Amino acid sequence: VSENTTPEGRAPVPPEAGPAPTPGLQAAAPVDEARRHETVSRSVLRQIMESNWVVTLFAIVAAMLLGGVLIAAADAEVRESAGWLFARPTDFFSAIWNAVAGAYSALFQGAVFNAQGRNVAQMIRPITETMTISTPLIFAGLGIGLGFRAGLFNIGAQGQIILGAVLGGFIGFTFELPVVLHLVLAALGAALGGALWASIAGILKATTGANEVIVTIMLNNVAIYLIGWLLSTQAFRRPGSAQPLSPQILETARYPQLLGPQFRLHLGFLLALLAAAGVWWLMERSTLGLRFRAVGANPNAARTAGISVPRTTVWVMAIAGSLAGLAGSAQILGTETSGLTDGIAASFGFDAITVALLGRSKPGGTVLAGLLFGGLRAGGVLMQARTGTPIDIVLVVQSFIVLFIAAPPLVRAIFRLPQRGGMTRAEKRAAKTAQEVAA
Protein backbone atom coordinates (compact mmCIF):
# COMPACT_ATOMS: atom_id res chain seq x y z
CA VAL A 1 0.00 0.00 0.00
CA SER A 2 1.52 3.31 -1.09
CA GLU A 3 1.51 6.42 1.03
CA ASN A 4 -0.87 8.09 -1.47
CA THR A 5 -3.59 5.50 -1.09
CA THR A 6 -5.73 4.15 1.68
CA PRO A 7 -5.60 0.50 2.73
CA GLU A 8 -8.64 -0.12 0.53
CA GLY A 9 -6.82 1.24 -2.53
CA ARG A 10 -8.67 4.61 -2.78
CA ALA A 11 -7.10 8.03 -2.88
CA PRO A 12 -7.37 9.86 0.44
CA VAL A 13 -9.90 12.65 0.79
CA PRO A 14 -8.32 16.04 1.55
CA PRO A 15 -9.33 17.35 5.00
CA GLU A 16 -10.67 20.60 3.58
CA ALA A 17 -12.93 18.72 1.17
CA GLY A 18 -15.00 17.28 3.99
CA PRO A 19 -16.49 13.77 4.04
CA ALA A 20 -17.30 12.10 0.77
CA PRO A 21 -20.97 12.34 -0.28
CA THR A 22 -23.09 9.29 0.31
CA PRO A 23 -25.68 8.32 -2.33
CA GLY A 24 -28.24 7.49 0.34
CA LEU A 25 -27.86 10.87 1.97
CA GLN A 26 -28.18 12.62 -1.39
CA ALA A 27 -31.44 10.81 -2.08
CA ALA A 28 -32.78 11.78 1.33
CA ALA A 29 -31.99 15.48 0.84
CA PRO A 30 -35.43 16.44 -0.61
CA VAL A 31 -37.17 14.61 2.22
CA ASP A 32 -35.03 16.38 4.81
CA GLU A 33 -35.76 19.72 3.13
CA ALA A 34 -39.51 19.09 3.28
CA ARG A 35 -39.26 18.09 6.93
CA ARG A 36 -37.24 21.22 7.65
CA HIS A 37 -39.95 23.44 6.16
CA GLU A 38 -42.61 21.60 8.17
CA THR A 39 -40.52 22.06 11.32
CA VAL A 40 -40.22 25.79 10.63
CA SER A 41 -44.00 26.07 10.22
CA ARG A 42 -44.59 24.29 13.51
CA SER A 43 -42.00 26.49 15.21
CA VAL A 44 -43.71 29.67 14.01
CA LEU A 45 -47.08 28.42 15.24
CA ARG A 46 -45.58 27.58 18.64
CA GLN A 47 -44.06 31.02 18.96
CA ILE A 48 -47.45 32.58 18.24
CA MET A 49 -49.21 30.35 20.76
CA GLU A 50 -46.52 30.85 23.40
CA SER A 51 -46.62 34.64 23.46
CA ASN A 52 -47.49 35.37 27.08
CA TRP A 53 -50.52 37.24 28.30
CA VAL A 54 -48.60 40.48 28.65
CA VAL A 55 -47.74 40.42 24.95
CA THR A 56 -51.35 39.53 24.11
CA LEU A 57 -52.65 42.44 26.18
CA PHE A 58 -50.24 44.89 24.59
CA ALA A 59 -51.13 43.57 21.14
CA ILE A 60 -54.77 44.48 21.80
CA VAL A 61 -53.72 47.89 23.14
CA ALA A 62 -51.60 48.56 20.05
CA ALA A 63 -54.47 47.55 17.78
CA MET A 64 -56.86 49.88 19.62
CA LEU A 65 -54.37 52.75 19.37
CA LEU A 66 -54.02 52.29 15.63
CA GLY A 67 -57.78 52.01 15.39
CA GLY A 68 -58.00 55.35 17.19
CA VAL A 69 -55.75 56.91 14.56
CA LEU A 70 -58.09 55.68 11.84
CA ILE A 71 -61.16 56.90 13.74
CA ALA A 72 -59.62 60.36 13.99
CA ALA A 73 -58.69 60.33 10.30
CA ALA A 74 -62.25 59.39 9.32
CA ASP A 75 -63.86 62.11 11.45
CA ALA A 76 -65.02 65.20 9.52
CA GLU A 77 -64.48 67.58 12.45
CA VAL A 78 -60.88 66.43 12.87
CA ARG A 79 -60.15 66.96 9.20
CA GLU A 80 -61.73 70.41 9.30
CA SER A 81 -59.79 71.51 12.39
CA ALA A 82 -56.55 70.31 10.81
CA GLY A 83 -56.80 73.29 8.45
CA TRP A 84 -55.90 75.70 11.29
CA LEU A 85 -53.64 73.34 13.24
CA PHE A 86 -50.88 75.89 13.81
CA ALA A 87 -53.29 78.72 14.57
CA ARG A 88 -55.45 76.78 17.05
CA PRO A 89 -53.77 73.46 17.89
CA THR A 90 -56.00 72.91 20.92
CA ASP A 91 -59.06 72.68 18.66
CA PHE A 92 -57.36 70.01 16.58
CA PHE A 93 -56.36 67.82 19.52
CA SER A 94 -59.72 68.38 21.19
CA ALA A 95 -61.45 67.15 18.04
CA ILE A 96 -59.24 64.07 18.00
CA TRP A 97 -60.08 63.31 21.63
CA ASN A 98 -63.81 63.78 21.08
CA ALA A 99 -63.81 61.53 18.01
CA VAL A 100 -61.79 58.69 19.52
CA ALA A 101 -63.34 58.84 23.00
CA GLY A 102 -66.84 59.11 21.58
CA ALA A 103 -66.36 56.16 19.24
CA TYR A 104 -64.84 53.86 21.85
CA SER A 105 -67.42 54.95 24.43
CA ALA A 106 -70.19 53.98 22.03
CA LEU A 107 -68.37 50.73 21.30
CA PHE A 108 -68.30 49.91 25.02
CA GLN A 109 -71.96 50.83 25.52
CA GLY A 110 -72.96 48.66 22.58
CA ALA A 111 -70.89 45.71 23.75
CA VAL A 112 -70.97 45.66 27.56
CA PHE A 113 -73.33 48.02 29.35
CA ASN A 114 -75.58 50.85 28.25
CA ALA A 115 -75.90 53.25 31.18
CA GLN A 116 -78.36 55.37 29.20
CA GLY A 117 -80.91 52.58 29.00
CA ARG A 118 -84.42 53.32 30.24
CA ASN A 119 -84.69 50.05 32.14
CA VAL A 120 -82.58 47.10 33.24
CA ALA A 121 -83.31 45.16 30.07
CA GLN A 122 -81.92 47.92 27.87
CA MET A 123 -78.90 48.31 30.12
CA ILE A 124 -77.84 44.66 30.00
CA ARG A 125 -78.89 43.97 26.42
CA PRO A 126 -75.41 44.84 25.04
CA ILE A 127 -73.64 42.15 27.08
CA THR A 128 -76.24 39.58 26.08
CA GLU A 129 -75.69 40.48 22.42
CA THR A 130 -71.95 40.09 22.93
CA MET A 131 -72.44 36.62 24.39
CA THR A 132 -74.83 35.66 21.59
CA ILE A 133 -72.43 36.74 18.85
CA SER A 134 -69.47 35.16 20.61
CA THR A 135 -71.12 31.71 20.77
CA PRO A 136 -70.22 30.55 17.23
CA LEU A 137 -66.80 32.17 17.58
CA ILE A 138 -66.09 30.15 20.71
CA PHE A 139 -67.27 26.88 19.18
CA ALA A 140 -65.28 27.32 15.97
CA GLY A 141 -62.27 28.77 17.79
CA LEU A 142 -62.11 25.70 20.01
CA GLY A 143 -62.02 23.47 16.95
CA ILE A 144 -59.32 25.48 15.22
CA GLY A 145 -57.25 25.71 18.40
CA LEU A 146 -57.48 21.95 18.90
CA GLY A 147 -56.11 21.48 15.39
CA PHE A 148 -53.30 23.96 16.03
CA ARG A 149 -52.18 22.06 19.12
CA ALA A 150 -52.12 18.86 17.11
CA GLY A 151 -50.03 20.48 14.40
CA LEU A 152 -52.84 20.94 11.86
CA PHE A 153 -53.81 24.23 10.21
CA ASN A 154 -57.57 23.89 9.90
CA ILE A 155 -58.64 26.89 7.82
CA GLY A 156 -61.96 25.29 6.87
CA ALA A 157 -64.15 26.28 9.81
CA GLN A 158 -66.25 28.47 7.51
CA GLY A 159 -67.30 25.50 5.39
CA GLN A 160 -67.76 23.30 8.45
CA ILE A 161 -70.09 25.88 10.01
CA ILE A 162 -72.11 25.95 6.80
CA LEU A 163 -72.44 22.16 6.65
CA GLY A 164 -73.36 22.04 10.32
CA ALA A 165 -76.06 24.65 9.79
CA VAL A 166 -77.33 22.81 6.69
CA LEU A 167 -77.72 19.42 8.35
CA GLY A 168 -78.91 20.79 11.70
CA GLY A 169 -81.35 23.14 10.00
CA PHE A 170 -82.70 20.39 7.76
CA ILE A 171 -83.48 18.24 10.80
CA GLY A 172 -84.90 21.29 12.55
CA PHE A 173 -87.46 22.28 9.92
CA THR A 174 -88.28 18.91 8.35
CA PHE A 175 -89.11 16.50 11.16
CA GLU A 176 -91.75 16.94 13.84
CA LEU A 177 -90.40 15.36 17.02
CA PRO A 178 -90.77 15.83 20.78
CA VAL A 179 -89.12 18.92 22.20
CA VAL A 180 -85.95 17.56 23.82
CA LEU A 181 -85.39 14.79 21.27
CA HIS A 182 -85.78 17.15 18.33
CA LEU A 183 -83.27 19.66 19.69
CA VAL A 184 -80.73 16.97 20.57
CA LEU A 185 -80.96 15.34 17.15
CA ALA A 186 -80.68 18.68 15.35
CA ALA A 187 -77.60 19.67 17.37
CA LEU A 188 -75.99 16.25 16.87
CA GLY A 189 -76.77 16.48 13.17
CA ALA A 190 -75.00 19.82 13.00
CA ALA A 191 -71.95 18.38 14.77
CA LEU A 192 -71.99 15.40 12.42
CA GLY A 193 -72.20 17.63 9.36
CA GLY A 194 -69.15 19.62 10.42
CA ALA A 195 -67.24 16.47 11.38
CA LEU A 196 -67.87 14.77 8.04
CA TRP A 197 -66.86 17.87 6.10
CA ALA A 198 -63.63 18.28 8.08
CA SER A 199 -62.88 14.55 7.83
CA ILE A 200 -62.48 14.93 4.07
CA ALA A 201 -59.39 17.05 4.65
CA GLY A 202 -58.22 14.75 7.44
CA ILE A 203 -58.48 11.62 5.30
CA LEU A 204 -56.71 13.27 2.36
CA LYS A 205 -53.96 14.46 4.70
CA ALA A 206 -53.58 11.03 6.27
CA THR A 207 -53.64 8.97 3.08
CA THR A 208 -52.00 11.18 0.46
CA GLY A 209 -50.20 13.86 2.48
CA ALA A 210 -52.35 16.60 0.94
CA ASN A 211 -51.81 19.99 2.52
CA GLU A 212 -54.71 20.59 4.89
CA VAL A 213 -54.55 24.36 4.43
CA ILE A 214 -55.21 24.15 0.70
CA VAL A 215 -57.81 21.40 1.04
CA THR A 216 -59.82 23.18 3.74
CA ILE A 217 -59.75 26.47 1.83
CA MET A 218 -61.09 24.73 -1.26
CA LEU A 219 -63.75 22.98 0.83
CA ASN A 220 -64.87 26.40 2.06
CA ASN A 221 -65.66 27.41 -1.51
CA VAL A 222 -67.40 24.11 -2.18
CA ALA A 223 -69.59 24.59 0.92
CA ILE A 224 -70.56 28.11 -0.16
CA TYR A 225 -71.72 26.94 -3.58
CA LEU A 226 -73.30 23.81 -2.10
CA ILE A 227 -75.62 25.72 0.24
CA GLY A 228 -76.57 28.03 -2.62
CA TRP A 229 -77.60 25.03 -4.71
CA LEU A 230 -79.41 23.30 -1.85
CA LEU A 231 -81.55 26.38 -1.21
CA SER A 232 -82.77 26.15 -4.79
CA THR A 233 -84.01 22.58 -4.35
CA GLN A 234 -87.49 21.59 -3.24
CA ALA A 235 -86.21 19.94 -0.06
CA PHE A 236 -84.72 23.17 1.31
CA ARG A 237 -86.59 26.04 -0.30
CA ARG A 238 -89.49 27.62 1.56
CA PRO A 239 -92.77 27.12 -0.33
CA GLY A 240 -93.92 30.29 -2.07
CA SER A 241 -90.68 32.18 -1.41
CA ALA A 242 -88.85 33.86 -4.28
CA GLN A 243 -85.70 34.17 -2.17
CA PRO A 244 -83.19 31.39 -1.41
CA LEU A 245 -84.60 30.77 2.06
CA SER A 246 -85.52 27.59 3.91
CA PRO A 247 -88.59 27.08 6.13
CA GLN A 248 -88.43 28.32 9.70
CA ILE A 249 -86.91 26.11 12.37
CA LEU A 250 -89.66 24.41 14.35
CA GLU A 251 -90.09 25.53 17.94
CA THR A 252 -89.20 22.06 19.21
CA ALA A 253 -85.72 22.24 17.63
CA ARG A 254 -84.70 25.70 18.84
CA TYR A 255 -82.25 26.44 21.61
CA PRO A 256 -84.20 27.83 24.59
CA GLN A 257 -83.73 31.53 25.28
CA LEU A 258 -81.99 32.01 28.60
CA LEU A 259 -83.42 35.41 29.59
CA GLY A 260 -86.78 35.44 27.86
CA PRO A 261 -88.03 36.48 24.44
CA GLN A 262 -86.76 40.07 24.72
CA PHE A 263 -83.15 38.82 24.49
CA ARG A 264 -81.47 36.71 21.81
CA LEU A 265 -79.15 34.93 24.26
CA HIS A 266 -79.83 31.20 24.06
CA LEU A 267 -78.68 27.86 25.43
CA GLY A 268 -75.94 27.63 22.82
CA PHE A 269 -73.75 29.98 24.85
CA LEU A 270 -73.79 27.65 27.85
CA LEU A 271 -73.06 24.72 25.54
CA ALA A 272 -70.05 26.62 24.19
CA LEU A 273 -68.72 27.02 27.73
CA LEU A 274 -69.29 23.30 28.35
CA ALA A 275 -67.49 22.54 25.08
CA ALA A 276 -64.53 24.61 26.28
CA ALA A 277 -64.40 22.59 29.49
CA GLY A 278 -64.66 19.38 27.46
CA VAL A 279 -61.80 20.38 25.16
CA TRP A 280 -59.67 21.23 28.20
CA TRP A 281 -60.31 17.80 29.70
CA LEU A 282 -59.67 16.12 26.35
CA MET A 283 -56.32 17.80 25.79
CA GLU A 284 -55.04 17.84 29.36
CA ARG A 285 -56.49 14.77 31.06
CA SER A 286 -57.26 12.11 28.44
CA THR A 287 -55.10 9.58 26.63
CA LEU A 288 -56.47 10.72 23.28
CA GLY A 289 -55.45 14.29 24.06
CA LEU A 290 -51.96 13.08 24.95
CA ARG A 291 -51.73 11.54 21.50
CA PHE A 292 -52.92 14.77 19.91
CA ARG A 293 -50.29 16.78 21.79
CA ALA A 294 -47.57 14.26 21.00
CA VAL A 295 -48.30 14.41 17.28
CA GLY A 296 -48.39 18.19 17.40
CA ALA A 297 -45.10 18.39 19.30
CA ASN A 298 -43.16 15.91 17.16
CA PRO A 299 -44.88 13.57 14.67
CA ASN A 300 -41.73 11.51 14.15
CA ALA A 301 -41.27 10.89 17.86
CA ALA A 302 -44.98 10.08 18.21
CA ARG A 303 -44.71 7.60 15.34
CA THR A 304 -41.69 6.00 16.98
CA ALA A 305 -43.65 5.69 20.22
CA GLY A 306 -46.33 3.68 18.40
CA ILE A 307 -48.92 6.40 17.80
CA SER A 308 -50.69 6.21 14.45
CA VAL A 309 -50.19 9.70 13.04
CA PRO A 310 -52.66 9.25 10.11
CA ARG A 311 -55.41 7.99 12.41
CA THR A 312 -54.74 10.81 14.86
CA THR A 313 -54.95 13.33 12.02
CA VAL A 314 -58.40 12.09 11.03
CA TRP A 315 -59.60 12.15 14.64
CA VAL A 316 -58.35 15.71 15.17
CA MET A 317 -60.05 17.01 12.05
CA ALA A 318 -63.30 15.20 12.86
CA ILE A 319 -63.48 16.62 16.40
CA ALA A 320 -62.51 20.09 15.19
CA GLY A 321 -65.18 19.90 12.50
CA SER A 322 -67.82 18.79 14.98
CA LEU A 323 -67.11 21.86 17.11
CA ALA A 324 -67.41 24.10 14.06
CA GLY A 325 -70.64 22.29 13.18
CA LEU A 326 -71.98 23.19 16.62
CA ALA A 327 -71.18 26.80 15.76
CA GLY A 328 -73.52 26.34 12.81
CA SER A 329 -76.16 24.93 15.14
CA ALA A 330 -75.83 28.01 17.36
CA GLN A 331 -76.66 30.12 14.33
CA ILE A 332 -79.55 28.20 12.80
CA LEU A 333 -81.08 26.74 15.98
CA GLY A 334 -80.53 29.74 18.24
CA THR A 335 -79.88 33.07 16.55
CA GLU A 336 -81.21 32.85 12.98
CA THR A 337 -84.21 30.55 13.45
CA SER A 338 -86.22 32.32 10.75
CA GLY A 339 -84.62 30.11 8.14
CA LEU A 340 -81.44 28.92 6.48
CA THR A 341 -79.76 31.36 4.06
CA ASP A 342 -76.52 31.31 2.13
CA GLY A 343 -75.11 33.88 4.57
CA ILE A 344 -75.82 31.85 7.71
CA ALA A 345 -72.11 31.51 8.56
CA ALA A 346 -71.34 35.22 8.03
CA SER A 347 -67.55 35.41 8.56
CA PHE A 348 -67.46 33.47 11.82
CA GLY A 349 -65.23 30.73 10.42
CA PHE A 350 -62.51 33.17 9.41
CA ASP A 351 -62.80 35.26 12.57
CA ALA A 352 -62.48 32.07 14.61
CA ILE A 353 -58.92 31.67 13.32
CA THR A 354 -58.04 34.97 14.96
CA VAL A 355 -59.92 33.94 18.10
CA ALA A 356 -57.88 30.73 18.34
CA LEU A 357 -54.60 32.59 17.83
CA LEU A 358 -55.51 35.31 20.32
CA GLY A 359 -56.53 32.66 22.84
CA ARG A 360 -53.25 30.78 22.24
CA SER A 361 -55.28 27.71 21.29
CA LYS A 362 -56.26 27.19 24.94
CA PRO A 363 -59.95 26.76 25.87
CA GLY A 364 -59.97 29.54 28.46
CA GLY A 365 -58.16 31.96 26.21
CA THR A 366 -60.44 31.07 23.31
CA VAL A 367 -63.54 31.88 25.38
CA LEU A 368 -62.13 35.28 26.36
CA ALA A 369 -61.02 36.02 22.80
CA GLY A 370 -64.44 35.01 21.50
CA LEU A 371 -66.11 37.40 23.94
CA LEU A 372 -63.75 40.18 22.86
CA PHE A 373 -64.52 39.73 19.18
CA GLY A 374 -68.21 39.30 19.92
CA GLY A 375 -68.09 42.61 21.77
CA LEU A 376 -66.37 44.31 18.85
CA ARG A 377 -69.08 43.06 16.51
CA ALA A 378 -71.94 44.01 18.83
CA GLY A 379 -70.54 47.41 19.77
CA GLY A 380 -69.55 48.34 16.24
CA VAL A 381 -73.19 48.73 15.25
CA LEU A 382 -73.92 51.31 17.97
CA MET A 383 -70.59 53.03 17.30
CA GLN A 384 -71.54 53.61 13.68
CA ALA A 385 -75.11 54.65 14.50
CA ARG A 386 -74.17 57.11 17.24
CA THR A 387 -70.91 58.65 15.99
CA GLY A 388 -70.93 57.92 12.28
CA THR A 389 -67.65 56.02 12.55
CA PRO A 390 -67.48 53.38 9.80
CA ILE A 391 -68.08 49.91 11.17
CA ASP A 392 -65.21 48.73 8.99
CA ILE A 393 -62.92 50.24 11.64
CA VAL A 394 -63.81 47.22 13.79
CA LEU A 395 -62.57 44.89 11.06
CA VAL A 396 -59.36 46.89 10.81
CA VAL A 397 -58.83 46.62 14.58
CA GLN A 398 -59.31 42.86 14.34
CA SER A 399 -56.75 42.75 11.54
CA PHE A 400 -54.25 44.71 13.62
CA ILE A 401 -54.77 42.26 16.48
CA VAL A 402 -53.93 39.40 14.12
CA LEU A 403 -50.82 41.24 12.94
CA PHE A 404 -49.47 41.85 16.42
CA ILE A 405 -50.38 38.41 17.75
CA ALA A 406 -48.53 36.84 14.82
CA ALA A 407 -45.41 38.89 15.60
CA PRO A 408 -44.67 38.80 19.36
CA PRO A 409 -41.14 40.21 18.86
CA LEU A 410 -42.69 43.29 17.20
CA VAL A 411 -44.92 43.91 20.23
CA ARG A 412 -41.96 43.47 22.57
CA ALA A 413 -39.92 45.94 20.52
CA ILE A 414 -42.71 48.57 20.39
CA PHE A 415 -43.41 48.51 24.13
CA ARG A 416 -39.80 47.71 25.17
CA LEU A 417 -40.80 44.47 26.81
CA PRO A 418 -37.98 42.12 27.88
CA GLN A 419 -37.16 39.32 25.48
CA ARG A 420 -37.84 35.83 26.70
CA GLY A 421 -34.86 33.60 27.27
CA GLY A 422 -34.27 29.96 27.97
CA MET A 423 -36.63 27.16 27.12
CA THR A 424 -40.13 28.24 26.16
CA ARG A 425 -43.21 26.68 27.66
CA ALA A 426 -43.88 24.98 24.33
CA GLU A 427 -40.48 23.30 24.46
CA LYS A 428 -41.01 22.31 28.09
CA ARG A 429 -44.44 20.90 27.27
CA ALA A 430 -43.04 19.04 24.26
CA ALA A 431 -40.34 17.50 26.44
CA LYS A 432 -42.92 16.54 29.07
CA THR A 433 -45.15 15.01 26.40
CA ALA A 434 -42.23 13.02 25.02
CA GLN A 435 -41.47 11.69 28.50
CA GLU A 436 -45.11 10.70 29.04
CA VAL A 437 -45.22 8.94 25.68
CA ALA A 438 -41.97 7.13 26.38
CA ALA A 439 -43.29 6.02 29.75
Task: Report the location of each language-model feature.
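Interfacial/capping segments of alpha-helical transmembrane domains
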Residues: 66-112, 235-245
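Hydrophobic core segments of alpha-helical transmembrane domains in multi-pass membrane transport
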Residues: 56-72, 137-144, 165-171, 191-194, ...
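Transmembrane alpha-helical segments in multi-pass inner-membrane proteins
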Residues: 318-324, 332-399
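Transmembrane helix-bundle core of multi-pass membrane transporters
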Residues: 106, 110, 216, 220-285, ...
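Alpha-helical transmembrane segments of multi-pass membrane proteins, especially transporters
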Residues: 52-56, 129, 133, 156-165, ...
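Cytosolic-side transmembrane-helix boundaries in multi-pass membrane proteins
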Residues: 2-63, 68-76, 277, 304-312, ...
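Single transmembrane alpha-helix segments in multi-pass membrane proteins
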Residues: 70-72, 76, 101-175, 187, ...
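Helix-loop-helix "hairpin" substructures at the membrane interface of multi-pass membrane proteins
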Residues: 196, 262-338, 363-368, 438-439
